[in-house]
Each structure stands twice: as C-alpha cells, then as structure tokens.
C-alpha cells in the first residue's frame, strides 16, 4: 500500500516532511516527542510532467527514477522553528525513540556521501572533442538525475542549517562528568566520598565528536556543491561556444512554489538564488560556531580542544566562503551574459 511522502502531522500543517531516508520518524515529530505516522494518500500521487514535453524524455525518465517525483517545498525553505503540539483527534500511537543529534547528523552525512558518489565527476563529464560539442550539449543532462540531485541538495542544506542551530549549543553543554558530580554533590554522608572517581582530572567541556560530525556534513555538502558548480560552468561554456542559431536541449529543473510552476527561462535564476541564500546561511552558522569556540578557549577544561576546533572552523569557513563566492560570481556572470533573467 502506498503511503504519503509526508507524515500526517506535516501533511495537516501543509509543511514539507523533513524525514531523512532510513529514519523511522521526521525531525519535527522527534522534537515534539510525538508519533510520526504515515497514512495512505487521500488521492493517488500524480508525477509532475516535465516542462519541455517535446524533447525532455530523458529528463522525465530521470525525474521519476525514484518513483514519485517529489520536488523541494519552496514555501518551507527556511522554516527552522519549533512546531506546535500535535493536533487533537489524530490517532494516538506509542512515540518512536527520539533520534539523537548524532544519529541525525550521521544519517545526513551518509545521504550527502551517497549523493556525491552519484554525481559524475568533472573527469567523467566535462572532457569532449570540439567536433562533438553539439551532440554532447544535447546529452549532457542524461548522465545523472539533475532534478532529484538538486531537490536533495536543497533539502540537505536546509537540514544542516537546522542541525547547526541545535548541535553547536549542545556541544558546549555536555552532561556533568562523574568528577564534576562529586564536586557538586550535596547528599549528606554520600558514598562517593569513600570511592575514587574514574577521572582524576575534569573531562573536556567541548563535545569534540559532535562538532566533528557537524563539520563533516558541511564539508561533504561543499563537495557536492563544488561538483555541481563545475557542471554549471561547463553548460555555460557550451552555450557561449555553440553557434548562435543552435539552442541546446538542456534539462532545466522544475521549480514549484505551491501550485505555481516557474517558467523554464526563470527557473534557473530562482534555483541559483536559493542555493546562494542557503550557502550564505551556512557561512553564518560557521561564524557562530567560531564565536562560541572563542568564548571557551581560555577555559582550562576546553583550551586544547578549542584550539583544534578553532583551526578546523577556520579551514571550513575559508572553504565555505570560497564556494559561496564561486556560486555568486557564476550567477552574476550568467545574468551579465543575459543567459538568466
């Protein structure tokens, strides 16, 4: 039996369901500690029709490669706030175990890694004889599912921005260690006074493992974005190189805002604007992390870890800003060349 792509709670609120593939529940239901239920649809799913019916057969095939074509929910682009309690009247079920931040980050990292492996490299796609450039322009989009890749990229970038906001504060508020609990103990004649704590020195106050997971997700996302940027530059180069009277059959991904479908000639511009905006948000998240690390660098319990994390953050921030700059210049160049509206 087919089930909705969104859980009942997200469906009723008309929100995109942020459930990661392989996870038993979505992050909204996990945060609210309520049941995440997927019911049959009220009417059959209907795959979206491709924009260019005459010559987009390969794009239509790739768009429906994973079953139902589910596009990115643009109305829910940056909806990162907490959701309200479950509406009354819904069936009550025992809530599934709430995923930890580490589980959600690990699932996101695995999804990004699979995406990177699925996108052909520059060596595989961007080397072609000049004599075959025209034929190559008509088939360049058949090497991978561009629509699905971009939809997933936007989903994962939004999820990472949300997880940054949760994981960074949690990394600086680790649970109290045994030695610290002994020092804070107010129980009269407590037995802890007759035993030796496992650690004679306080454990680090920074959760280095959790921070490394966050940064690993961001690095892998940048790997995917850099690969797609190379693909975009190759397409732009072909447009500028081919004869003026030749219109290559590039498969422009479909952009939907509610029931509105953006025209093909403006869809690419909208897509680039959203990618740049999401990268801007992620750069700001790294800067927030740097500021928080700087606040604890003089704490004796976090000094060494803070130095390592600060260096990692600096490297990540430099690369994130570089990737953001590349996408911004790419978009501006296309606008200047009147290839985008």
Swiss-Prot record:
GO biological process, one term: positive regulation of DNA-templated transcription
CDD domains according to UniProt: GAL4
PROSITE patterns: ZN2_CY6_FUNGAL_1 (PS00463), ZN2_CY6_FUNGAL_2 (PS50048)
GO cellular component: nucleus
SUPFAM superfamilies with a match to the protein in the record: Zn2/Cys6 DNA-binding domain (SSF57701)
Record's keyword terms, sorted: Activator, DNA-binding, Metal-binding, Nucleus, Transcription, Transcription regulation, Zinc
Single GO MF descriptor: DNA-binding transcription factor activity
Pfam families in the record: Zn_clus
Localisation per UniProt entry: Nucleus
Cross-referenced InterPro entries: AtrR-like, Zn2-C6_fun-type_DNA-bd_sf, Zn2Cys6_DnaBD
Coiled-coil regions listed: none
DNA-binding segment(s): 7-36
Major location (coarse): nucleus
Domain of life: Eukaryota
Function: Positive regulation of the major cellulase and xylanase genes (cbh1, cbh2, egl2 and xyn2). Binds to the 5'-GGCTAATAA-3' site present in the cbh1 promoter.
Protein name: Transcription factor ACEII
Organism: Hypocrea jecorina
Lineage of the organism: Eukaryota, Fungi, Dikarya, Ascomycota, Pezizomycotina
């Amino acid at each position: 039996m087919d089930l909705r792509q969104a859980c009942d709670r997200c469906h009723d609120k008309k929100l995109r369901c942020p459930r990661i593939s392989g996870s038993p529940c979505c992050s909204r239901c996990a945060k609210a500690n309520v049941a995440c239920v997927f019911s049959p649809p009220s009417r059959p799913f209907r795959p979206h029709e491709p924009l260019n019916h005459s010559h987009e057969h390969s794009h239509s095939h790739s768009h429906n490669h994973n079953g139902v074509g589910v596009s990115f929910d643009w109305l829910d682009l940056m909806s990162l706030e907490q959701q309200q309690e479950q509406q009354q009247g819904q069936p009550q079920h025992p809530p599934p175990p709430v995923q930890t931040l580490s589980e959600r980050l690990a699932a996101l990292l695995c999804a990004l890694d699979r995406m990177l492996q699925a996108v052909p490299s520059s060596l595989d796609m961007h080397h072609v004889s000049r004599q075959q450039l025209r034929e190559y322009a008509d088939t360049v989009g058949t090497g991978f599912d561009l629509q699905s890749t971009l939809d997933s990229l936007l989903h994962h970038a939004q999820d990472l921005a949300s997880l940054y906001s949760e994981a960074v504060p949690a990394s600086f508020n680790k649970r109290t260690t045994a030695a610290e609990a002994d020092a804070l103990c107010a129980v009269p004649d407590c037995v802890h006074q007759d035993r030796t704590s496992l650690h004679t020195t306080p454990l680090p106050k920074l959760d280095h493992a959790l921070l490394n997971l966050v940064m690993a997700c961001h690095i892998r996302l940048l790997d995917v974005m850099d690969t797609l940027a190379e693909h975009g530059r190759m397409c732009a180069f072909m447009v500028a190189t081919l004869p003026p009277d030749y219109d290559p059959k590039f498969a422009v991904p479909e952009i939907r805002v509610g029931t509105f479908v953006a025209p093909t000639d403006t869809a690419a511009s909208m897509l680039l604007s959203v990618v740049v905006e999401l990268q801007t948000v992620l750069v700001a998240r790294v800067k927030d992390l740097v500021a928080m690390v700087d606040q604890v660098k003089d704490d004796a319990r976090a000094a060494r870890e803070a130095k390592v994390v600060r260096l990692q953050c600096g490297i990540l921030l430099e690369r994130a800003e570089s990737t953001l700059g590349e996408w911004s210049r790419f978009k501006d160049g296309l606008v200047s060349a009147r290839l985008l509206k």
